From Swiss-Prot:
This is Trans-1,2-dihydrobenzene-1,2-diol dehydrogenase. The record marks D176 as: May play an important role for the adaptation of the alcohol substrate into the binding site. Belongs to the Gfo/Idh/MocA family. The gene is DHDH. Keywords: NADP, Oxidoreductase.
Amino acid sequence: MALRWGIVSVGLISSDFTAVLQTLPRSEHQVVAVAARDLSRAKEFAQKHDIPKAYGSYEELAKDPSVEVAYIGTQHPQHKAAVMLCLAAGKAVLCEKPTGVNAAEVREMVAEARSRALFLMEAIWTRFFPASEALRSVLAQGTLGDLRVARAEFGKNLIHVPRAVDRAQAGGALLDIGIYCVQFTSMVFGGQKPEKISVVGRRHETGVDDTVTVLLQYPGEVHGSFTCSITVQLSNTASVSGTKGMVQLLNPCWCPTELVVKGEHKEFPLPPVPKDCNFDNGAGMSYEAKHVWECLRKGMKESPVIPLSESELLADILEEVRKAIGVTFPQDKR
Protein backbone atom coordinates (compact mmCIF):
# COMPACT_ATOMS: atom_id res chain seq x y z
CA MET A 1 0.00 0.00 0.00
CA ALA A 2 1.43 3.35 -1.03
CA LEU A 3 2.61 5.84 1.56
CA ARG A 4 0.89 9.17 0.87
CA TRP A 5 3.31 12.06 1.33
CA GLY A 6 2.62 15.75 1.92
CA ILE A 7 5.55 18.09 1.30
CA VAL A 8 5.85 21.05 3.69
CA SER A 9 7.86 23.90 2.11
CA VAL A 10 9.07 24.24 -1.46
CA GLY A 11 12.80 24.88 -1.04
CA LEU A 12 15.64 23.05 -2.74
CA ILE A 13 15.76 20.15 -0.29
CA SER A 14 12.01 19.57 -0.66
CA SER A 15 12.40 19.58 -4.43
CA ASP A 16 15.12 16.93 -4.27
CA PHE A 17 13.17 14.74 -1.85
CA THR A 18 10.04 14.95 -3.99
CA ALA A 19 11.96 14.13 -7.16
CA VAL A 20 13.51 11.12 -5.45
CA LEU A 21 10.16 9.87 -4.14
CA GLN A 22 8.89 9.88 -7.69
CA THR A 23 11.65 7.51 -8.80
CA LEU A 24 10.33 4.91 -6.34
CA PRO A 25 7.48 2.47 -7.03
CA ARG A 26 4.08 4.19 -6.97
CA SER A 27 2.81 1.16 -5.12
CA GLU A 28 4.95 2.32 -2.16
CA HIS A 29 5.25 6.12 -2.40
CA GLN A 30 2.93 8.83 -3.74
CA VAL A 31 3.21 12.59 -3.26
CA VAL A 32 -0.37 13.81 -2.88
CA ALA A 33 0.04 17.41 -1.70
CA VAL A 34 2.48 20.27 -1.23
CA ALA A 35 2.23 23.43 0.86
CA ALA A 36 4.04 26.75 0.93
CA ARG A 37 3.27 30.04 2.63
CA ASP A 38 2.78 31.47 -0.87
CA LEU A 39 0.12 29.65 -2.91
CA SER A 40 1.71 30.62 -6.22
CA ARG A 41 4.97 28.96 -5.20
CA ALA A 42 3.12 25.85 -4.07
CA LYS A 43 1.29 25.68 -7.41
CA GLU A 44 4.56 26.12 -9.31
CA PHE A 45 6.15 23.30 -7.29
CA ALA A 46 3.09 21.09 -7.80
CA GLN A 47 3.19 21.65 -11.54
CA LYS A 48 6.92 20.90 -11.71
CA HIS A 49 6.55 17.64 -9.77
CA ASP A 50 3.07 16.63 -10.95
CA ILE A 51 1.48 16.82 -7.49
CA PRO A 52 -2.35 16.86 -7.46
CA LYS A 53 -2.90 19.37 -4.63
CA ALA A 54 -1.18 22.65 -3.73
CA TYR A 55 -1.89 24.67 -0.59
CA GLY A 56 -1.01 28.22 0.41
CA SER A 57 -0.61 27.35 4.08
CA TYR A 58 0.84 24.50 6.09
CA GLU A 59 -2.40 24.30 8.08
CA GLU A 60 -4.37 23.29 4.98
CA LEU A 61 -1.98 20.45 4.21
CA ALA A 62 -2.09 19.25 7.81
CA LYS A 63 -5.91 19.04 7.60
CA ASP A 64 -5.86 17.08 4.33
CA PRO A 65 -7.06 13.54 5.13
CA SER A 66 -5.26 12.12 2.10
CA VAL A 67 -1.85 13.00 3.60
CA GLU A 68 -0.45 10.17 5.71
CA VAL A 69 3.07 11.43 6.37
CA ALA A 70 4.49 14.95 6.20
CA TYR A 71 8.01 15.75 5.06
CA ILE A 72 9.24 18.95 6.73
CA GLY A 73 11.76 20.79 4.55
CA THR A 74 11.50 24.29 6.01
CA GLN A 75 14.46 26.23 7.39
CA HIS A 76 15.65 25.27 10.87
CA PRO A 77 13.67 27.79 12.96
CA GLN A 78 10.40 26.75 11.31
CA HIS A 79 10.82 23.01 11.98
CA LYS A 80 9.18 22.95 15.39
CA ALA A 81 5.99 24.78 14.41
CA ALA A 82 5.55 22.66 11.28
CA VAL A 83 6.20 19.39 13.12
CA MET A 84 3.83 20.26 15.97
CA LEU A 85 1.14 21.31 13.48
CA CYS A 86 1.35 18.04 11.58
CA LEU A 87 1.47 15.90 14.71
CA ALA A 88 -1.59 17.69 16.08
CA ALA A 89 -3.38 16.78 12.85
CA GLY A 90 -2.48 13.11 13.29
CA LYS A 91 0.23 12.89 10.65
CA ALA A 92 3.42 10.88 10.79
CA VAL A 93 6.43 13.18 10.31
CA LEU A 94 9.85 13.01 8.69
CA CYS A 95 11.63 16.24 9.62
CA GLU A 96 14.84 17.46 8.06
CA LYS A 97 17.81 17.72 10.36
CA PRO A 98 18.26 19.33 12.79
CA THR A 99 14.81 18.53 14.17
CA GLY A 100 15.02 21.61 16.37
CA VAL A 101 17.22 24.64 16.96
CA ASN A 102 17.90 23.56 20.54
CA ALA A 103 17.36 20.63 22.88
CA ALA A 104 14.17 22.06 24.40
CA GLU A 105 12.51 22.22 20.98
CA VAL A 106 13.48 18.64 20.18
CA ARG A 107 12.19 17.36 23.51
CA GLU A 108 8.88 19.14 23.00
CA MET A 109 8.41 17.54 19.58
CA VAL A 110 9.41 14.10 20.83
CA ALA A 111 6.99 14.37 23.76
CA GLU A 112 4.18 15.39 21.41
CA ALA A 113 4.83 12.49 19.04
CA ARG A 114 4.95 10.00 21.90
CA SER A 115 1.82 11.36 23.58
CA ARG A 116 -0.09 10.97 20.32
CA ALA A 117 1.55 7.63 19.44
CA LEU A 118 2.67 9.03 16.09
CA PHE A 119 5.79 8.33 14.06
CA LEU A 120 8.49 11.03 14.10
CA MET A 121 11.98 10.75 12.63
CA GLU A 122 14.88 13.12 12.09
CA ALA A 123 15.99 12.92 8.47
CA ILE A 124 19.64 12.07 9.02
CA TRP A 125 19.87 10.45 5.60
CA THR A 126 23.53 9.47 6.07
CA ARG A 127 22.55 6.55 8.31
CA PHE A 128 20.62 4.84 5.52
CA PHE A 129 23.26 4.84 2.79
CA PRO A 130 24.52 1.32 2.05
CA ALA A 131 28.07 2.48 2.82
CA SER A 132 26.95 3.53 6.32
CA GLU A 133 25.13 0.24 6.80
CA ALA A 134 28.28 -1.61 5.73
CA LEU A 135 30.33 0.39 8.24
CA ARG A 136 27.93 -0.57 11.03
CA SER A 137 28.31 -4.22 10.01
CA VAL A 138 32.10 -3.92 10.19
CA LEU A 139 31.81 -2.52 13.71
CA ALA A 140 29.30 -5.17 14.81
CA GLN A 141 31.50 -7.99 13.53
CA GLY A 142 34.49 -6.77 15.55
CA THR A 143 36.66 -6.46 12.44
CA LEU A 144 38.51 -3.48 13.91
CA GLY A 145 39.15 -5.07 17.29
CA ASP A 146 38.62 -2.85 20.32
CA LEU A 147 37.50 0.59 19.17
CA ARG A 148 39.54 3.57 20.27
CA VAL A 149 38.86 6.64 18.09
CA ALA A 150 36.20 8.02 15.73
CA ARG A 151 36.93 11.12 13.68
CA ALA A 152 34.91 13.21 11.21
CA GLU A 153 35.43 16.40 9.23
CA PHE A 154 32.92 18.42 7.26
CA GLY A 155 33.80 21.84 5.94
CA LYS A 156 32.72 23.94 2.97
CA ASN A 157 32.84 27.63 2.20
CA LEU A 158 29.18 28.53 2.60
CA ILE A 159 29.58 32.23 3.30
CA HIS A 160 27.75 33.02 0.05
CA VAL A 161 24.63 31.23 1.38
CA PRO A 162 22.68 33.88 3.34
CA ARG A 163 21.05 31.51 5.85
CA ALA A 164 24.43 29.92 6.69
CA VAL A 165 25.58 33.11 8.42
CA ASP A 166 22.19 34.33 9.63
CA ARG A 167 21.84 34.06 13.40
CA ALA A 168 18.07 34.57 13.20
CA GLN A 169 17.88 31.49 10.96
CA ALA A 170 20.03 29.42 13.36
CA GLY A 171 22.89 29.49 10.89
CA GLY A 172 26.47 28.38 11.42
CA ALA A 173 28.41 25.18 10.91
CA LEU A 174 27.14 23.07 13.80
CA LEU A 175 23.44 22.77 13.01
CA ASP A 176 23.82 22.71 9.25
CA ILE A 177 26.76 20.35 8.72
CA GLY A 178 28.30 19.63 12.12
CA ILE A 179 25.31 17.47 12.94
CA TYR A 180 26.59 14.96 10.38
CA CYS A 181 29.84 14.68 12.33
CA VAL A 182 28.10 14.36 15.70
CA GLN A 183 25.76 11.68 14.42
CA PHE A 184 28.78 9.75 13.12
CA THR A 185 30.56 9.56 16.47
CA SER A 186 27.26 8.78 18.16
CA MET A 187 26.57 5.97 15.68
CA VAL A 188 30.03 4.48 16.24
CA PHE A 189 29.71 4.49 20.02
CA GLY A 190 26.16 3.22 20.17
CA GLY A 191 24.29 6.39 21.01
CA GLN A 192 26.01 6.74 24.38
CA LYS A 193 26.13 10.07 26.15
CA PRO A 194 29.65 11.57 26.18
CA GLU A 195 31.22 11.84 29.63
CA LYS A 196 33.07 15.01 28.70
CA ILE A 197 32.96 17.50 25.82
CA SER A 198 35.85 19.85 25.02
CA VAL A 199 35.42 22.63 22.46
CA VAL A 200 37.51 25.17 20.60
CA GLY A 201 36.13 27.37 17.87
CA ARG A 202 35.55 30.76 16.39
CA ARG A 203 32.47 32.83 15.75
CA HIS A 204 31.62 34.56 12.51
CA GLU A 205 31.08 38.31 12.63
CA THR A 206 27.31 37.69 12.45
CA GLY A 207 27.37 35.72 15.70
CA VAL A 208 27.02 32.19 14.32
CA ASP A 209 29.67 29.50 14.72
CA ASP A 210 32.25 29.63 11.93
CA THR A 211 34.71 26.78 12.55
CA VAL A 212 34.55 24.40 15.50
CA THR A 213 36.62 21.45 16.73
CA VAL A 214 35.16 19.15 19.36
CA LEU A 215 36.53 16.27 21.44
CA LEU A 216 33.99 13.86 22.92
CA GLN A 217 35.08 11.48 25.68
CA TYR A 218 32.85 8.39 25.80
CA PRO A 219 32.56 5.65 28.44
CA GLY A 220 35.27 3.02 28.22
CA GLU A 221 38.13 5.44 27.51
CA VAL A 222 37.22 5.87 23.85
CA HIS A 223 36.76 9.20 22.14
CA GLY A 224 35.38 10.89 19.09
CA SER A 225 36.42 14.17 17.56
CA PHE A 226 35.22 16.35 14.74
CA THR A 227 35.78 19.64 12.99
CA CYS A 228 33.11 21.50 11.04
CA SER A 229 33.31 24.80 9.20
CA ILE A 230 31.30 27.12 6.95
CA THR A 231 34.39 29.03 5.83
CA VAL A 232 37.02 26.45 4.88
CA GLN A 233 37.17 23.25 2.86
CA LEU A 234 37.98 20.18 4.93
CA SER A 235 38.59 16.55 3.99
CA ASN A 236 34.89 15.68 4.44
CA THR A 237 35.79 12.15 5.50
CA ALA A 238 35.04 10.06 8.58
CA SER A 239 36.96 7.20 10.15
CA VAL A 240 36.96 4.71 12.99
CA SER A 241 40.13 3.14 14.37
CA GLY A 242 40.49 0.08 16.56
CA THR A 243 43.25 -2.21 17.75
CA LYS A 244 43.02 -4.28 14.54
CA GLY A 245 42.58 -1.63 11.88
CA MET A 246 40.68 1.34 10.49
CA VAL A 247 37.58 1.94 8.39
CA GLN A 248 36.95 5.16 6.44
CA LEU A 249 33.97 6.77 4.78
CA LEU A 250 35.42 8.78 1.91
CA ASN A 251 34.32 12.23 0.75
CA PRO A 252 31.42 13.03 0.85
CA CYS A 253 31.05 11.33 4.23
CA TRP A 254 27.58 12.77 4.84
CA CYS A 255 26.21 10.96 1.76
CA PRO A 256 28.85 8.26 1.29
CA THR A 257 29.28 5.84 -1.58
CA GLU A 258 32.83 4.62 -0.81
CA LEU A 259 34.15 2.71 2.18
CA VAL A 260 37.73 1.62 2.89
CA VAL A 261 37.97 -1.29 5.34
CA LYS A 262 41.54 -2.04 6.48
CA GLY A 263 42.82 -0.87 3.10
CA GLU A 264 40.17 -2.63 1.01
CA HIS A 265 38.18 -0.19 -1.13
CA LYS A 266 34.45 -0.83 -1.55
CA GLU A 267 31.97 1.13 -3.67
CA PHE A 268 28.21 1.43 -3.27
CA PRO A 269 26.72 3.01 -6.42
CA LEU A 270 23.69 5.24 -6.03
CA PRO A 271 20.34 4.56 -7.68
CA PRO A 272 19.53 6.58 -10.83
CA VAL A 273 19.78 10.32 -10.21
CA PRO A 274 16.54 12.28 -10.60
CA LYS A 275 16.59 15.24 -12.95
CA ASP A 276 17.53 18.62 -11.51
CA CYS A 277 18.89 17.38 -8.16
CA ASN A 278 20.27 20.31 -6.18
CA PHE A 279 22.46 18.51 -3.66
CA ASP A 280 25.34 16.03 -3.86
CA ASN A 281 24.20 12.41 -4.12
CA GLY A 282 20.57 13.50 -3.80
CA ALA A 283 19.40 10.15 -5.14
CA GLY A 284 20.44 8.72 -1.77
CA MET A 285 17.36 10.27 -0.18
CA SER A 286 15.56 7.20 -1.47
CA TYR A 287 17.17 5.11 1.27
CA GLU A 288 15.59 7.09 4.11
CA ALA A 289 12.25 7.22 2.28
CA LYS A 290 12.25 3.43 2.01
CA HIS A 291 13.08 3.19 5.71
CA VAL A 292 10.13 5.40 6.64
CA TRP A 293 7.86 3.20 4.51
CA GLU A 294 9.13 0.09 6.29
CA CYS A 295 8.68 1.65 9.74
CA LEU A 296 5.15 2.86 9.07
CA ARG A 297 4.00 -0.34 7.41
CA LYS A 298 5.25 -2.24 10.48
CA GLY A 299 3.34 0.12 12.78
CA MET A 300 6.48 1.55 14.36
CA LYS A 301 6.41 4.94 16.09
CA GLU A 302 10.10 5.71 15.69
CA SER A 303 13.12 4.52 13.75
CA PRO A 304 15.48 1.96 15.28
CA VAL A 305 18.29 3.49 13.18
CA ILE A 306 17.86 7.07 14.41
CA PRO A 307 15.65 6.72 17.50
CA LEU A 308 14.10 9.78 19.12
CA SER A 309 16.30 9.39 22.20
CA GLU A 310 19.33 9.82 19.97
CA SER A 311 17.85 12.90 18.30
CA GLU A 312 17.50 14.34 21.80
CA LEU A 313 21.11 13.41 22.60
CA LEU A 314 22.43 14.99 19.39
CA ALA A 315 20.52 18.18 20.20
CA ASP A 316 22.01 18.22 23.72
CA ILE A 317 25.54 17.86 22.35
CA LEU A 318 25.12 20.52 19.66
CA GLU A 319 23.66 22.98 22.15
CA GLU A 320 26.46 22.40 24.66
CA VAL A 321 29.10 22.85 21.96
CA ARG A 322 27.75 26.09 20.52
CA LYS A 323 27.20 27.61 23.95
CA ALA A 324 30.79 26.73 24.86
CA ILE A 325 31.95 29.16 22.16
CA GLY A 326 29.32 31.76 22.99
CA VAL A 327 26.81 31.13 20.21
CA THR A 328 23.16 31.58 21.13
CA PHE A 329 20.04 31.85 18.99
CA PRO A 330 16.84 33.85 19.54
CA GLN A 331 14.98 30.56 19.98
CA ASP A 332 17.05 29.76 23.09
CA LYS A 333 15.18 32.44 25.06
CA ARG A 334 11.69 31.15 24.39
